[in-house]
Swiss-Prot record:
PROSITE patterns: BHLH (PS50888). Residues 37-54 have a biased composition (Low complexity). InterPro entries: bHLH-TF_ACT-like_plant, bHLH_dom, HLH_DNA-bd_sf, TF_AMS/ICE1/BHLH6-like. It comes from Arabidopsis thaliana (Mouse-ear cress). Coiled coil: none annotated. One of its GO terms (cellular component) is nucleus. The lineage of its organism: Eukaryota, Viridiplantae, Streptophyta, Embryophyta, Tracheophyta. The keyword Cell cycle does not apply. This is Transcription factor bHLH35. It is found in: Nucleus. The gene is BHLH35. Residues 37-60 are annotated as: Disordered.
Length: 248
Protein backbone atom coordinates (compact mmCIF):
# COMPACT_ATOMS: atom_id res chain seq x y z
CA UNK A 1 0.00 0.00 0.00
CA UNK A 2 2.81 2.42 0.88
CA UNK A 3 4.48 1.69 -2.49
CA UNK A 4 1.30 2.65 -4.30
CA UNK A 5 1.01 5.95 -2.35
CA UNK A 6 4.67 6.81 -2.98
CA UNK A 7 4.24 6.13 -6.70
CA UNK A 8 1.15 8.35 -6.86
CA UNK A 9 2.95 11.19 -5.08
CA UNK A 10 5.97 10.82 -7.36
CA UNK A 11 3.81 11.02 -10.48
CA UNK A 12 1.85 13.94 -9.08
CA UNK A 13 4.92 16.13 -8.52
CA UNK A 14 6.47 15.41 -11.88
CA UNK A 15 6.01 18.59 -14.03
CA UNK A 16 4.02 16.84 -16.73
CA UNK A 17 1.91 14.90 -14.26
CA UNK A 18 1.33 17.98 -12.15
CA UNK A 19 0.05 19.97 -15.10
CA UNK A 20 -2.20 17.12 -16.12
CA UNK A 21 -3.65 16.66 -12.63
CA UNK A 22 -4.23 20.40 -12.01
CA UNK A 23 -6.90 22.21 -13.97
CA UNK A 24 -5.26 25.43 -15.31
CA UNK A 25 -7.11 27.63 -17.76
CA UNK A 26 -5.65 30.75 -19.35
CA UNK A 27 -7.98 32.97 -21.27
CA UNK A 28 -5.84 34.51 -24.02
CA UNK A 29 -8.56 37.01 -24.74
CA UNK A 30 -7.77 38.94 -21.56
CA UNK A 31 -6.37 42.34 -22.60
CA UNK A 32 -3.28 43.48 -20.74
CA UNK A 33 -4.73 46.90 -20.05
CA UNK A 34 -7.83 45.36 -18.43
CA UNK A 35 -5.66 43.22 -16.20
CA UNK A 36 -3.80 46.26 -14.80
CA UNK A 37 -6.17 49.15 -15.36
CA UNK A 38 -7.68 48.95 -11.91
CA UNK A 39 -11.22 48.98 -13.28
CA UNK A 40 -12.32 46.20 -10.92
CA UNK A 41 -14.48 46.94 -7.95
CA UNK A 42 -12.25 48.02 -5.09
CA UNK A 43 -14.45 46.07 -2.68
CA UNK A 44 -13.56 42.77 -4.37
CA UNK A 45 -10.26 40.96 -3.80
CA UNK A 46 -9.32 41.43 -7.48
CA UNK A 47 -9.99 45.17 -7.27
CA UNK A 48 -7.88 45.51 -4.14
CA UNK A 49 -5.01 43.67 -5.81
CA UNK A 50 -5.17 45.82 -8.96
CA UNK A 51 -5.19 49.14 -7.06
CA UNK A 52 -1.40 49.24 -6.45
CA UNK A 53 -0.79 48.40 -10.12
CA UNK A 54 -3.06 51.26 -11.18
CA UNK A 55 -1.23 53.67 -8.89
CA UNK A 56 2.09 52.55 -10.34
CA UNK A 57 0.86 53.23 -13.87
CA UNK A 58 -0.33 56.73 -12.93
CA UNK A 59 2.95 57.42 -11.13
CA UNK A 60 4.98 56.28 -14.14
CA UNK A 61 2.86 58.39 -16.48
CA UNK A 62 3.41 61.47 -14.30
CA UNK A 63 7.13 60.80 -14.11
CA UNK A 64 7.42 60.61 -17.90
CA UNK A 65 5.36 63.76 -18.29
CA UNK A 66 7.66 65.67 -15.94
CA UNK A 67 10.69 64.33 -17.81
CA UNK A 68 9.26 65.48 -21.14
CA UNK A 69 8.54 68.92 -19.70
CA UNK A 70 12.10 69.25 -18.45
CA UNK A 71 13.49 68.14 -21.80
CA UNK A 72 11.20 70.64 -23.50
CA UNK A 73 12.54 73.41 -21.24
CA UNK A 74 16.12 72.29 -21.88
CA UNK A 75 15.50 72.35 -25.63
CA UNK A 76 14.23 75.94 -25.40
CA UNK A 77 17.55 77.23 -24.01
CA UNK A 78 19.86 75.27 -26.31
CA UNK A 79 20.39 77.32 -29.51
CA UNK A 80 21.56 74.60 -31.89
CA UNK A 81 18.68 72.33 -32.90
CA UNK A 82 19.60 69.06 -34.60
CA UNK A 83 16.88 66.52 -33.85
CA UNK A 84 13.88 66.42 -31.54
CA UNK A 85 14.54 63.05 -29.89
CA UNK A 86 15.61 62.87 -26.25
CA UNK A 87 19.15 61.64 -26.94
CA UNK A 88 19.83 64.53 -29.35
CA UNK A 89 18.46 67.09 -26.88
CA UNK A 90 20.84 65.91 -24.15
CA UNK A 91 23.76 65.66 -26.60
CA UNK A 92 23.14 69.20 -27.90
CA UNK A 93 22.92 70.53 -24.35
CA UNK A 94 26.24 68.91 -23.39
CA UNK A 95 27.96 70.30 -26.50
CA UNK A 96 26.54 73.75 -25.82
CA UNK A 97 27.71 73.72 -22.18
CA UNK A 98 31.18 72.55 -23.22
CA UNK A 99 31.35 75.40 -25.74
CA UNK A 100 30.37 77.92 -23.07
CA UNK A 101 33.01 76.54 -20.73
CA UNK A 102 35.63 76.87 -23.47
CA UNK A 103 34.62 80.49 -24.14
CA UNK A 104 34.73 81.20 -20.41
CA UNK A 105 38.28 79.89 -20.08
CA UNK A 106 39.31 81.83 -23.18
CA UNK A 107 37.92 85.10 -21.83
CA UNK A 108 39.51 84.53 -18.42
CA UNK A 109 42.89 83.98 -20.10
CA UNK A 110 42.49 87.21 -22.09
CA UNK A 111 41.59 89.13 -18.93
CA UNK A 112 44.63 87.78 -17.09
CA UNK A 113 46.82 88.72 -20.05
CA UNK A 114 45.47 92.27 -20.11
CA UNK A 115 45.89 92.65 -16.37
CA UNK A 116 49.51 91.49 -16.56
CA UNK A 117 50.38 93.82 -19.47
CA UNK A 118 52.19 97.05 -18.38
CA UNK A 119 50.29 100.25 -19.12
CA UNK A 120 53.27 101.71 -20.98
CA UNK A 121 52.99 99.03 -23.66
CA UNK A 122 49.40 100.10 -24.33
CA UNK A 123 50.38 103.64 -25.37
CA UNK A 124 49.68 104.63 -28.94
CA UNK A 125 52.42 104.82 -31.51
CA UNK A 126 53.40 108.25 -32.78
CA UNK A 127 53.55 107.01 -36.33
CA UNK A 128 50.86 108.28 -38.65
CA UNK A 129 48.23 105.83 -39.68
CA UNK A 130 47.76 105.31 -43.39
CA UNK A 131 44.04 105.83 -42.92
CA UNK A 132 44.73 109.48 -42.13
CA UNK A 133 45.93 109.99 -45.69
CA UNK A 134 42.68 108.73 -47.19
CA UNK A 135 40.52 111.52 -48.66
CA UNK A 136 37.58 112.68 -46.60
CA UNK A 137 35.07 111.51 -49.19
CA UNK A 138 36.36 107.92 -49.07
CA UNK A 139 36.25 107.91 -45.29
CA UNK A 140 32.66 109.11 -45.33
CA UNK A 141 31.73 106.35 -47.75
CA UNK A 142 33.31 103.75 -45.48
CA UNK A 143 31.41 105.10 -42.50
CA UNK A 144 28.13 104.84 -44.39
CA UNK A 145 28.88 101.30 -45.52
CA UNK A 146 29.86 100.31 -42.00
CA UNK A 147 26.77 101.92 -40.51
CA UNK A 148 24.43 100.20 -42.93
CA UNK A 149 25.97 96.76 -42.39
CA UNK A 150 25.84 96.98 -38.60
CA UNK A 151 22.21 98.11 -38.59
CA UNK A 152 20.94 95.12 -40.59
CA UNK A 153 19.90 91.68 -39.33
CA UNK A 154 22.26 89.30 -41.10
CA UNK A 155 20.57 85.88 -40.98
CA UNK A 156 22.89 82.90 -41.36
CA UNK A 157 20.27 80.19 -40.90
CA UNK A 158 16.51 79.97 -40.42
CA UNK A 159 14.79 76.72 -39.41
CA UNK A 160 11.10 76.07 -38.79
CA UNK A 161 10.31 72.65 -37.27
CA UNK A 162 6.97 71.16 -36.23
CA UNK A 163 7.16 69.44 -32.82
CA UNK A 164 3.59 68.20 -32.54
CA UNK A 165 0.65 69.31 -30.40
CA UNK A 166 0.32 72.54 -32.43
CA UNK A 167 3.84 73.65 -31.51
CA UNK A 168 6.33 75.05 -34.03
CA UNK A 169 10.00 75.75 -33.23
CA UNK A 170 11.69 78.62 -35.07
CA UNK A 171 15.49 78.79 -34.86
CA UNK A 172 17.24 81.89 -36.23
CA UNK A 173 21.04 82.21 -36.32
CA UNK A 174 22.46 85.70 -37.00
CA UNK A 175 25.78 87.48 -36.94
CA UNK A 176 26.17 89.47 -33.75
CA UNK A 177 25.89 93.17 -34.53
CA UNK A 178 24.72 96.27 -32.73
CA UNK A 179 21.30 95.76 -31.13
CA UNK A 180 20.61 92.60 -33.16
CA UNK A 181 18.80 90.99 -30.23
CA UNK A 182 16.46 93.96 -29.87
CA UNK A 183 15.81 94.05 -33.61
CA UNK A 184 14.93 90.35 -33.73
CA UNK A 185 12.42 90.81 -30.92
CA UNK A 186 10.88 93.77 -32.75
CA UNK A 187 10.50 91.71 -35.93
CA UNK A 188 8.75 88.82 -34.18
CA UNK A 189 6.47 91.19 -32.27
CA UNK A 190 5.45 92.88 -35.53
CA UNK A 191 4.39 89.54 -37.06
CA UNK A 192 1.62 89.03 -34.45
CA UNK A 193 2.51 85.38 -33.85
CA UNK A 194 1.20 83.24 -30.98
CA UNK A 195 4.53 82.99 -29.17
CA UNK A 196 4.63 80.42 -26.34
CA UNK A 197 8.20 81.06 -25.21
CA UNK A 198 11.47 82.34 -26.66
CA UNK A 199 15.17 82.33 -25.90
CA UNK A 200 18.06 84.53 -27.07
CA UNK A 201 21.68 83.43 -26.72
CA UNK A 202 24.95 85.03 -27.84
CA UNK A 203 27.88 82.74 -28.54
CA UNK A 204 31.10 83.00 -30.61
CA UNK A 205 30.10 86.19 -32.40
CA UNK A 206 26.67 84.84 -33.30
CA UNK A 207 23.16 85.17 -31.92
CA UNK A 208 20.82 82.20 -31.61
CA UNK A 209 17.12 83.01 -31.31
CA UNK A 210 14.77 80.10 -30.53
CA UNK A 211 11.03 80.75 -30.54
CA UNK A 212 8.21 78.30 -29.75
CA UNK A 213 5.04 79.28 -31.61
CA UNK A 214 1.52 77.87 -31.50
CA UNK A 215 0.74 76.76 -35.05
CA UNK A 216 -0.44 73.77 -37.07
CA UNK A 217 1.86 71.61 -39.19
CA UNK A 218 0.24 72.95 -42.38
CA UNK A 219 1.47 76.46 -41.49
CA UNK A 220 5.17 75.48 -41.43
CA UNK A 221 6.16 76.84 -44.85
CA UNK A 222 3.87 79.87 -44.56
CA UNK A 223 5.42 80.70 -41.19
CA UNK A 224 8.95 80.46 -42.57
CA UNK A 225 8.14 82.79 -45.48
CA UNK A 226 6.41 85.20 -43.11
CA UNK A 227 9.50 85.44 -40.90
CA UNK A 228 11.83 85.85 -43.89
CA UNK A 229 9.62 88.62 -45.28
CA UNK A 230 9.46 90.35 -41.90
CA UNK A 231 13.26 90.37 -41.49
CA UNK A 232 13.72 91.57 -45.08
CA UNK A 233 11.22 94.39 -44.60
CA UNK A 234 12.94 95.44 -41.39
CA UNK A 235 16.33 95.55 -43.11
CA UNK A 236 14.92 97.75 -45.86
CA UNK A 237 13.69 100.29 -43.33
CA UNK A 238 17.11 100.36 -41.66
CA UNK A 239 19.13 100.97 -44.86
CA UNK A 240 20.32 104.62 -44.89
CA UNK A 241 19.75 106.78 -47.97
CA UNK A 242 22.89 108.23 -49.48
CA UNK A 243 22.99 111.95 -50.23
CA UNK A 244 25.67 114.25 -51.61
CA UNK A 245 25.61 116.48 -48.53
CA UNK A 246 26.35 113.51 -46.27
CA UNK A 247 29.72 112.99 -47.93
CA UNK A 248 31.11 116.32 -46.68
Amino acid sequence: MEDIVDQELSNYWEPSSFLQNEDFEYDRSWPLEEAISGSYDSSSPDGAASSPASKNIVSERNRRQKLNQRLFALRSVVPNITKMDKASIIKDAISYIEGLQYEEKKLEAEIRELESTPKSSLSFSKDFDRDLLVPVTSKKMKQLDSGSSTSLIEVLELKVTFMGERTMVVSVTCNKRTDTMVKLCEVFESLNLKILTSNLTSFSGMIFHTVFIEADEEEQEVLRLKIETGIGAYNETQSPTLSIDSLY
